[in-house]
Amino acid sequence: KELKQSPVANLSNALAGKLPGLITVQTSGQPGEDASSLFIRGVGTYGTSNPLVVIDGLPRSQTDFNQLDANEIESVTILKDASSSSLYGIQGANGVIVVTTKRGVDREKPLISFTVQQAVQQPIRLPETMSSYEQALYYRDMDMNDGQTERYTPEVLDIIKNGSDPYLYPNVNWFDEILKKNSMQSQYNINISGSALGKLRYFISGSYVNQGTLLKHQDIFEKNYGVKSKFDRYNFRSNVDLDATSMLNIRIDLAGRLETRVGPGSDFSNVFSVITTRSPSSQPVFNPDGTLGAGSALEIPFQQNPYGIVTQSGYYTRHTNVMSGTLSAKHKLDFITKGLSAQVYFSFESNNYQHTTRLQSFDSFWYKGKDATGEAIYQPHSVKSRLSTTDSRWVERYTYLDVRLNYDRTFAEKHQISAQLLGNRTLRSQNAELPYAYQGISSRIAYNFDTRYYLEANIGYNGSENFPPKKRYGFFPSFSAGWVLSDEKFISLPSWIQLIKLRGSYGTVGNDKIGGQRWLYITEFTPGGTAMGTYQFGVSPQSVAGYNESRVGNKFVTWEKSAKGNVGFDLSLFKDNAVQFTFDYFWEKRNNILTTPGDVPDYVGITNVAPRNSGKVENKGIEAELRFNKRINKDLSIFANLQMTYARNKVLENDEPIP
């Protein structure tokens, strides 16, 4: 419900401020490219810090997560400590985001909901820029302080101040000229859920999102190229559950996504870079004859006109098609022992990308004033060219196989035991590359007595083909414990205290996203084509190409290792747990971070030193959350949520040279 209340096209932005320990950083406002970077409990490595994303029990990319429609989602959970993430072993060091999508429930009639959201997007903050006159005064003071001849005479300063000659002495606020104050965003969604025949449950969702651009002059851009800057996305999801027998449940999930991005030939970030660094006096937007300006009496032309970049530099189109399917079956094995079940997942995902860029230069002229006869003087700066076309296409394929044994049983009404044994394998291929492969075995066992004492142990044994044969697998254990003090009979508490729980965990996890190239343990050789890469043979010496060692392999390269600890408590107060408070203190020591050695001197003669796992980072902090939820009556409730996360890291070792 909270996610749906945020009118954003990208799910990562909807999570801002919603979950304690999750930090979101948005760095772009480009339509369709405005995803936030996600960090769980700060940054524990100077390598890759992206968390693992799991959707409906299966690992997915963060892009899949970003482009989910909030109306499809039942819940989002963050796994932060080692105990909760160690099942993911080699991929769990940066934390895990677990998403559960909605499913059908038994009901007499289908439930149909239709949602429409209209939103206005606007920049949070833009730089305040100098005017040409303020800039001229700044330069005058600088010249005076340096004892230099002032570059602007009093007469020129008056012209700049009065704006009497805007072509030779322009004053352009490029942010106002290029950016709109706001843009529109539209979202439409329809959900249908229900059941049939007493055995079938279904959830079907479809949505459409459109984001407009913050760039001005789109009428000119559309007139020039017949396209409109935008981001369109269509989402589809179908989750079906079938009780084939009283013992067998089958799930069939299908999901798809179609995306289209269109924009000016110059990248959106480049447009921002241009208008941020462009001087207000660099050039007028237009010359007196209506051509694009390229210089002024104050600055020689050396940069392209921002208006031309937005409207006449070409355009790009990017199409993304994603289709995924999951088939799973769960069978109860009560005939072996009560509470035992087996479950198998098979998932397939296909991603197709097509990017087309059509670029061209445009006409612009430097207006240099008038000659003695009163004729305008123009000097060409850039000349319009034909559109050049660049196409790129690539395909990604994911397959995932997961087999699980689950056990959940309560003995004597007070002893509850749950356990899981899991084996999985993931293959990801891109175009003609050799596939990336992961596989492993994980297990979990949890025990609680009378919902007062909790113990849990997890073990992960996972590996990746990216590492040397003898270093591909790692062992990742963890454990956790909890104690509900408020349920103890020997502790007397006021009636308004509903819950006091202490908890702690410790364990190790890994991170295989170490950066660098694939298979760093392999030494590579390339043919030599220069005098340094040839050999002389024969009576009459002939040059024969040899091979150079282009990359030195590191046969000890491995994943990052993280030791994590966490202690905290939960507190609930008043009737219906109206006030809830949680507090956690966490710490992490990350080792084996891939680092380029800095302590190998040049005189050794090795210019391409193999990276090695020598980096170390320490990260620790606290997080707290205070929630208030009070239902006044059936139509009115009050909700408030206050969160705080503080994380501080320290680089302990970066393989730097010793001074």
Annotate each language-model stretch with its function.
Residues 265, 288, 392-395:
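Compositionally biased, intrinsically disordered linkers/stalks adjacent to structured regions
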Residues 1-236, 250, 638-640:
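Short, small/polar-rich motifs associated with maturation and membrane association
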Residues 124-125, 207, 354-365:
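Short, solvent-exposed beta-strand-terminating loops
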Residues 50, 186, 239-248, 254-258, ...:
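Extracellular/periplasmic, surface-exposed regions of secreted and cell-surface proteins
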Residues 59, 149, 292-293, 376:
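Short, solvent-exposed loop/turn motifs
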Residues 145-151, 164, 284-291, 302-304, ...:
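Extracytoplasmic gating/loop element in the C-terminal half of outer-membrane beta-barrel translocons
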Residues 272-274:
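Short, compositionally biased small/polar motifs
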